[in-house]
Amino acid sequence: MNFTEDHLDVHEDMEDYLQSKIALLKSSKRKVINNKILKYLPNKFKDITFNHSNKKNTEQLELENLSSDDYIIKALPNNKFIMISKGFEMNFDTNKLMGEHNVLNIAAAFAAFRILNLTFTDYQNVVRSFRGLPHRIEWVREINNINFYNDSKATNVASTVAALEVFRSKNVFLIAGGDSKKLPLAPLKKYLTKNVAHLFLIGQDALKIQNFFKNLDMLKIFMCDDLANAVNEAFNLAKSGDIILEFNGTEIKEM
């Protein structure tokens, strides 16, 4: 289980959303939980946890605080990883799953495999062959060395941040809009000023998003009629090496 700001168009506030998550845990026999959200949960819900580490050396990890049901994953160069738990260490590699969020997904999947008593070979085969879900930072095509990605399943701010982190060294042309679900947009500001120079807006909350970000230096905002218009505008402005990232951060109901 993970927990980020979302669905505030349905829930009264984040506490109400959290309680709905806790209700799911109450009906679950086993629980795979992101270690970072344990502080929000009653102790009785601690079961199997996963997290990732950015520390340069595995020796710096606080292994003495781990139990055999705690898993920490660390990304290494060339799509290689190391999974560490108490009395356990495993090196493996994966296919080209992009982004820090997928590192966490890999750790969560491993914890689930352990619950099901599946073998490491089973796990390794799945991780190596899995290319990601459709519409989640899904590569679409490349034209003139401009790459198009479809991230239409990313319907909240946290998902947007995850995608922009993947392309933090690139110049991104971002297409967004739709229903913002009453989510706060402020966390996006620092990411939009890093590597997004052009923002193309469509959908019902396009004007709201434009008004929120219109004073950001260096950010050019374009109001577009629909997806086709936004893609064409972005492509006309993009240069070799740029990224056009379609639809993330909000829920597009106009599709």
Regions found by a protein language model. Name each.
Residues 2-148, 210-213, 218-220:
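Acidic, Mg2+-coordinating active-site environments of NTP-dependent enzymes
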Residues 111-121, 125-135, 139-255:
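ATP-dependent carboxylate-amine ligase
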